[in-house]
C-alpha cells in the first residue's frame, strides 16, 4: 500500500503511511515521509523545489484541499487576503477565494509571495526571517526584530520569538528543507552557516543557475 501510494504520486497518503515506519528502518521512509511530487505553477514558472516542498509538508501535508481554522487554503496554506495582494486580484480575497484550492494557482502565488518576502529589506534573503514572516506575518517580524534582544545571534533570535507557533514552524520547515536538500544531493550552505553562528542566506534555484552559467563562462 505504501509503495503504491508513493508510485501513484499520492504524497498526502504516502506521508501518513510513511509516518508509521519511523522506527522500521524501511528504505521507503525517505520518499514517503518526505514526498517529492512534481510541482507545476499555473504559469509554468520556475519553483524553488526544496523550499516549497518543505513548506507544503508543514503547512498542508500535501493535501490540496486543506483549510485551516483561520481560513488559509490549499497546498501552501495561503490566506485569501495575502493571495489577493500577491495576485493583485481582490477577488481572491473574497468571492473567488476557493480558487486557492487549485494546486497550480496555489504554487504560483506561493512562489511569488516567497519572492516578495525575500526582497523585503527586513528579510534580506535570510531564511530565518523569511519563515518567521511567512508564518507570523511581516508586521510581526518587524515588531519582534525591534523588541527581541538577540545580539545578532540567529539561533537566539529564533528562540526569542514570542510566538511558540512561529518558533516551531521555523524549526520544522528548516528541518524539512535541509532533509530535502540532502535527498536531492544539494549543497547545505545554509545549514553550515547556522552551525557557524551565521544567518542562513537563501539562494534560489534560479540564482544557482545563473551562478553555474557564470562559472561556466569563466
Mark where each language-model region is:
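Catalytic glycan-binding domains that act on GlcNAc-containing polysaccharides
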Residues: 1-218
Amino acid at each position: 500500500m505504501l509503495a503504491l501510494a508513493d508510485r501513484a504520486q499520492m504524497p498526502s497518503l504516502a506521508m501518513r503511511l510513511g509516518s508509521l515506519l519511523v522506527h522500521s528502518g524501511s528504505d521507503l521512509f525517505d520518499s514517503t515521509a518526505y514526498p517529492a511530487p512534481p510541482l507545476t505553477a499555473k504559469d509554468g514558472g520556475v519553483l524553488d523545489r526544496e523550499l516549497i516542498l518543505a513548506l507544503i509538508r508543514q503547512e498542508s501535508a500535501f493535501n490540496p484541499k486543506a483549510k485551516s481554522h483561520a481560513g488559509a487554503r490549499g497546498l501552501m496554506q495561503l490566506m485569501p487576503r495575502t493571495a489577493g495582494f500577491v495576485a493583485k486580484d481582490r477577488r481572491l480575497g473574497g468571492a473567488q477565494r476557493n480558487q486557492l484550492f487549485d494546486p497550480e494557482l496555489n504554487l504560483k502565488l506561493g512562489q511569488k509571495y516567497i519572492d516578495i518576502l525575500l526582497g523585503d529589506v527586513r528579510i534580506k534573503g535570510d531564511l530565518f526571517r523569511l519563515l518567521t514572516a511567512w508564518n507570523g506575518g511581516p508586521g510581526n517580524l518587524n515588531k519582534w526584530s525591534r523588541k527581541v534582544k538577540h545580539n545578532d545571534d540567529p539561533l537566539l533570535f529564533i528562540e526569542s520569538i514570542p510566538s511558540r507557533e512561529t518558533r516551531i514552524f521555523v524549526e520544522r520547515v528548516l528541518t524539512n528543507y535541509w532533509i530535502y536538500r540532502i535527498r536531492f544531493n544539494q549543497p547545505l550552505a545554509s545549514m553550515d552557516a547556522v552551525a557557524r553562528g551565521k544567518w542562513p542566506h537563501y539562494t534560489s534555484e534560479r540564482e544557482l543557475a545563473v551562478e553555474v552559467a557564470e562559472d561556466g563562462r569563466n
